[in-house]
């Protein structure tokens, strides 16, 4: 099974002009996107809560969370974001993908438009 990456922008929803380009690993098993904390701080995005998460190996970790804007292929969405710590890779999670209207095709390892439902 391969790894899917995308180039997307992250920004503070209160300051739309300043954006940072990142390479995200698309993780269809992750509910939320993760961006390194230093980038979120640079954009003025502040955490509003701390949540516990379980990793694939069973370890339990805690991470700060906030709200960030994301842009990909001209689509823009706002979504919860995890503040990544040192060593954490930028991840694009399902909540953000659905906000864009995309889903990961597991066979072709690419993003495809999804059928939107109310």
Each PLM stretch: what is its role?
Residues 1-118:
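Pepsin/retropepsin-fold aspartyl endopeptidases
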């Amino acid at each position: 099974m391969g790894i899917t990456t995308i180039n997307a922008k992250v920004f503070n929803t209160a300051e739309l002009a300043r954006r940072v380009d990142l390479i995200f690993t698309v993780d269809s098993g992750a509910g939320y996107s993760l961006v390194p904390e230093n980038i979120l701080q640079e954009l003025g995005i502040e955490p509003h809560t701390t949540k516990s998460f379980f990793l694939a190996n069973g370890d339990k970790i805690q991470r700060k969370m906030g709200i960030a804007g994301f842009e990909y292929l001209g689509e823009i969405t706002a979504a919860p974001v995890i503040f990544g710590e040192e060593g954490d890779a930028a991840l694009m999670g399902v909540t953000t993908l659905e906000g864009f209207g995309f889903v990961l095709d597991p066979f072709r390892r690419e993003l495809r438009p999804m059928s939107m439902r109310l």
